[in-house]
Each structure stands twice: as C-alpha cells, then as structure tokens.
C-alpha cells in the first residue's frame, strides 16, 4: 500500500479540518497520535479497508488528497462567481481562488443572485466534491466530509441543489490549478 494512501486511511489527524479536531502540542508524540487516530476512526465510524486504486477517480482523489478541500472551494467560487460579484465578495477571495474564478471553464450560475455567505460557499464546496466523488468507495466517501469544517444547517434554495453536468471538468481543473499553485 502506498504511503499517501495509508495516511488517508489510518492518520486522519494529518488531514482532518482543524475546526473538527486540532491536536494539542502536548499530545503530538507518536504514541499519542496513534491513540488519537484510533479514537477519531472510532468516533466517526471510519472503515479501514483498502482504497481501490484501480478505480481511476479514487486513485486521482488519493493522489490529490492534500488539495481537495481548497480545490472544491475554488470550484464552488467559480460556479457562483456571478453571485460573489453581485454580493461584493469577489475581491475578498484569496488571490489563487480569485484568479481561478476568472478562467472561462463553465458558465456562472447567473440564475442565483441572492445572499451568498462564506458558510454557504463552504457548503457548496462540499457538495461539489461529493458530487464529483459519487462513484468512489465508501471508505473515501466517509472521509471527504472530514476535509471540511462541520457543516452548519444552511438554508439553501433549490437553485443551489441542482445537479451539475459540468462538475467533472470543473473539479478536475480546480484540483490541477490548486496542485500547481500549492
């Protein structure tokens, strides 16, 4: 098994979103990390089977695990760039995400002009990545939500929930863009 795959399966401390869990410095020893990783695996009910590297999408996700949350956020910002501009949030994006939103990859969701918040964008990023990951193993699907901070109840309109035909290309391009600039 590849080292990058092992850390996804057995070392959630190394990649879990810091708002879900942050390891205190006093517990940063190898023994403590091992125990806390076991607790996290149990607490979240994470399976410990094998990642199916013969599944090209699963292999792709494993290879780019470190940038998935950032790439998903970039994809959501790209898709809803019109709403971001309308609400004056475009220039509050980090430079990398702002630059990615300027690429002409997909059309913007111009049908939505309501209030869009950072929490809403995080939820949309999560949805982009879960849609992209629809045909991967349960082991991967269980771990993807942990890349994001715990999702609050978000009052979303139906315009956000529509399935996107261009999700595959948008997320792949965002991953490549994030990886190149990581």
Predicted regions mapped to residue ranges:
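General marker for long, soluble alpha-helical cores
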Residues: 1-182
């Amino acid at each position: 098994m590849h080292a990058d795959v092992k850390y996804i399966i057995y070392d959630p401390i190394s990649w879990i979103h810091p708002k879900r869990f942050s390891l205190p410095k006093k517990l940063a020893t190898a023994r403590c990390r091992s125990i806390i990783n076991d607790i996290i695996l149990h607490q979240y009910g994470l399976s410990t089977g094998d990642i199916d590297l013969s599944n090209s999408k699963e292999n792709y996700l494993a290879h780019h695990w470190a940038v998935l949350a950032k790439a998903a956020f970039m994809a959501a910002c790209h898709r809803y760039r019109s709403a971001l501009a309308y609400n004056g949030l475009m220039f509050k994006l980090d430079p990398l995400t702002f630059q990615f939103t300027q690429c002409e990859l997909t059309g913007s969701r111009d049908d939505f002009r309501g209030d869009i918040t950072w929490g809403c964008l995080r939820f949309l990023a999560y949805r982009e990545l879960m849609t992209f990951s629809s045909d991967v193993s349960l082991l991967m699907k269980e771990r993807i939500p942990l890349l994001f901070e715990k999702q609050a109840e978000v009052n979303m309109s139906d315009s956000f929930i529509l399935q996107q035909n261009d999700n595959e290309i948008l997320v792949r391009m965002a991953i490549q863009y994030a990886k190149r600039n990581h």
